[in-house]
Amino acid sequence: MSKTGKYYEIDWREEDLRACIDDDFDGDALAVVEAYFANVAKVAEKKPTILGHFDLIKKINGDGKFFDENNPRYTAAANAALMTAARNRCVLEVNTSAAYRGFRKDYFPSDAILKDWLILSGNVVITADAHDAKALTYGFEEAAAKLKELGYTKVQVLGKDGFIPCAL
Protein backbone atom coordinates (compact mmCIF):
# COMPACT_ATOMS: atom_id res chain seq x y z
CA MET A 1 0.00 0.00 0.00
CA SER A 2 2.80 2.42 0.82
CA LYS A 3 4.80 3.90 -2.03
CA THR A 4 7.57 5.22 0.21
CA GLY A 5 7.70 2.41 2.77
CA LYS A 6 7.37 4.98 5.56
CA TYR A 7 5.23 4.66 8.64
CA TYR A 8 3.27 7.72 9.73
CA GLU A 9 1.78 8.84 13.03
CA ILE A 10 -1.66 9.62 11.66
CA ASP A 11 -3.15 10.43 15.06
CA TRP A 12 -0.96 13.14 16.50
CA ARG A 13 0.29 15.81 14.09
CA GLU A 14 -1.65 17.11 11.11
CA GLU A 15 1.55 17.43 9.07
CA ASP A 16 2.19 13.69 9.42
CA LEU A 17 -1.26 12.77 8.17
CA ARG A 18 -0.91 15.29 5.34
CA ALA A 19 2.48 13.78 4.36
CA CYS A 20 0.96 10.29 4.37
CA ILE A 21 -1.91 11.41 2.15
CA ASP A 22 0.30 13.34 -0.26
CA ASP A 23 3.44 11.20 -0.40
CA ASP A 24 2.03 7.68 -0.25
CA PHE A 25 -1.50 8.07 -1.59
CA ASP A 26 -1.15 10.79 -4.26
CA GLY A 27 -3.37 13.18 -2.32
CA ASP A 28 -6.27 10.72 -2.00
CA ALA A 29 -7.20 10.97 1.68
CA LEU A 30 -9.94 8.36 1.33
CA ALA A 31 -7.37 5.88 0.03
CA VAL A 32 -5.55 6.38 3.34
CA VAL A 33 -8.82 5.70 5.15
CA GLU A 34 -9.35 2.52 3.12
CA ALA A 35 -5.81 1.35 3.87
CA TYR A 36 -6.30 2.12 7.57
CA PHE A 37 -9.51 0.10 7.83
CA ALA A 38 -7.98 -2.73 5.79
CA ASN A 39 -5.28 -2.91 8.47
CA VAL A 40 -7.90 -2.80 11.23
CA ALA A 41 -9.53 -5.81 9.54
CA LYS A 42 -6.17 -7.61 9.48
CA VAL A 43 -5.85 -7.02 13.22
CA ALA A 44 -9.41 -8.32 13.75
CA GLU A 45 -8.47 -11.50 11.85
CA LYS A 46 -5.96 -12.20 14.66
CA LYS A 47 -8.94 -12.49 17.04
CA PRO A 48 -7.92 -9.95 19.69
CA THR A 49 -10.15 -9.94 22.73
CA ILE A 50 -10.56 -6.17 22.42
CA LEU A 51 -10.33 -4.35 19.11
CA GLY A 52 -9.23 -0.85 20.00
CA HIS A 53 -8.79 2.44 18.17
CA PHE A 54 -11.25 1.25 15.55
CA ASP A 55 -11.58 4.58 13.75
CA LEU A 56 -8.52 6.37 15.12
CA ILE A 57 -7.93 7.65 11.58
CA LYS A 58 -10.52 10.35 12.36
CA LYS A 59 -8.73 11.69 15.45
CA ILE A 60 -7.23 14.80 13.86
CA ASN A 61 -9.84 15.10 11.12
CA GLY A 62 -11.97 17.59 13.05
CA ASP A 63 -14.59 19.28 10.86
CA GLY A 64 -13.58 17.08 7.92
CA LYS A 65 -10.21 18.75 7.46
CA PHE A 66 -8.77 15.78 5.52
CA PHE A 67 -11.75 13.63 4.50
CA ASP A 68 -15.52 13.27 4.83
CA GLU A 69 -16.37 10.71 7.50
CA ASN A 70 -19.77 10.19 5.82
CA ASN A 71 -18.34 9.54 2.36
CA PRO A 72 -19.45 6.15 0.97
CA ARG A 73 -15.80 5.07 0.61
CA TYR A 74 -15.21 5.80 4.31
CA THR A 75 -18.32 3.97 5.45
CA ALA A 76 -17.70 0.99 3.15
CA ALA A 77 -14.15 0.60 4.46
CA ALA A 78 -15.31 0.91 8.08
CA ASN A 79 -18.16 -1.55 7.54
CA ALA A 80 -15.83 -4.13 5.97
CA ALA A 81 -13.59 -3.93 9.04
CA LEU A 82 -16.63 -4.16 11.33
CA MET A 83 -17.79 -7.32 9.58
CA THR A 84 -14.36 -8.87 10.12
CA ALA A 85 -14.44 -7.87 13.79
CA ALA A 86 -17.89 -9.41 14.22
CA ARG A 87 -16.84 -12.67 12.53
CA ASN A 88 -13.92 -12.88 14.93
CA ARG A 89 -16.03 -12.07 17.99
CA CYS A 90 -14.05 -9.02 19.02
CA VAL A 91 -15.18 -6.70 21.79
CA LEU A 92 -15.09 -3.18 20.34
CA GLU A 93 -13.40 -0.51 22.41
CA VAL A 94 -15.27 2.74 23.03
CA ASN A 95 -12.37 5.09 23.71
CA THR A 96 -12.68 8.49 25.42
CA SER A 97 -9.06 9.61 25.00
CA ALA A 98 -9.44 11.98 22.03
CA ALA A 99 -12.03 14.00 23.94
CA TYR A 100 -9.85 14.03 27.07
CA ARG A 101 -6.87 15.29 25.09
CA GLY A 102 -8.95 17.92 23.29
CA PHE A 103 -8.69 16.49 19.77
CA ARG A 104 -12.42 15.80 19.41
CA LYS A 105 -15.69 16.18 21.25
CA ASP A 106 -16.85 12.67 20.37
CA TYR A 107 -15.37 9.28 21.13
CA PHE A 108 -14.05 6.38 19.08
CA PRO A 109 -15.85 4.76 17.33
CA SER A 110 -18.31 7.17 15.77
CA ASP A 111 -22.04 6.96 16.43
CA ALA A 112 -22.64 5.58 12.93
CA ILE A 113 -20.12 2.79 13.49
CA LEU A 114 -21.56 2.02 16.92
CA LYS A 115 -25.07 1.77 15.43
CA ASP A 116 -23.82 -0.75 12.87
CA TRP A 117 -21.88 -2.64 15.54
CA LEU A 118 -24.99 -2.99 17.69
CA ILE A 119 -26.64 -4.91 14.85
CA LEU A 120 -23.57 -7.10 14.25
CA SER A 121 -22.49 -7.84 17.82
CA GLY A 122 -23.05 -5.13 20.38
CA ASN A 123 -20.14 -6.18 22.56
CA VAL A 124 -18.33 -3.03 23.67
CA VAL A 125 -16.03 -2.01 26.48
CA ILE A 126 -15.48 1.61 27.56
CA THR A 127 -11.83 2.60 27.97
CA ALA A 128 -9.88 5.77 28.57
CA ASP A 129 -6.54 4.88 26.98
CA ALA A 130 -5.24 6.79 29.98
CA HIS A 131 -1.70 8.06 30.04
CA ASP A 132 -2.23 9.85 33.34
CA ALA A 133 -4.34 9.18 36.42
CA LYS A 134 -6.80 12.04 35.78
CA ALA A 135 -7.88 10.35 32.56
CA LEU A 136 -8.62 6.91 34.03
CA THR A 137 -12.40 7.21 33.89
CA TYR A 138 -12.74 10.40 31.85
CA GLY A 139 -15.97 10.50 29.89
CA PHE A 140 -17.20 7.09 31.02
CA GLU A 141 -20.62 8.35 32.15
CA GLU A 142 -21.08 10.33 28.93
CA ALA A 143 -19.94 7.37 26.81
CA ALA A 144 -22.36 5.08 28.65
CA ALA A 145 -25.19 7.58 28.12
CA LYS A 146 -24.32 7.82 24.40
CA LEU A 147 -24.33 4.03 24.07
CA LYS A 148 -27.71 3.86 25.78
CA GLU A 149 -29.03 6.57 23.45
CA LEU A 150 -27.85 4.48 20.48
CA GLY A 151 -29.74 1.42 21.75
CA TYR A 152 -27.11 -0.43 23.77
CA THR A 153 -28.31 -2.05 26.97
CA LYS A 154 -24.98 -3.37 28.27
CA VAL A 155 -21.22 -2.99 28.13
CA GLN A 156 -18.56 -5.58 28.84
CA VAL A 157 -16.53 -5.13 32.02
CA LEU A 158 -13.29 -7.01 32.52
CA GLY A 159 -13.19 -8.88 35.80
CA LYS A 160 -10.79 -11.42 37.28
CA ASP A 161 -12.49 -14.24 35.36
CA GLY A 162 -12.89 -12.40 32.05
CA PHE A 163 -15.59 -10.19 30.63
CA ILE A 164 -18.99 -9.91 32.25
CA PRO A 165 -21.93 -7.93 30.86
CA CYS A 166 -22.90 -4.86 32.86
CA ALA A 167 -26.29 -3.20 32.33
CA LEU A 168 -26.28 0.44 31.31
Where are these regions (language model features)?
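Extended substrate/RNA-proximal surfaces in nucleic-acid metabolism proteins
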Residues: 1-87
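Charged catalytic cores and adjacent phosphate/nucleic-acid-binding surfaces used
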Residues: 7, 64-168
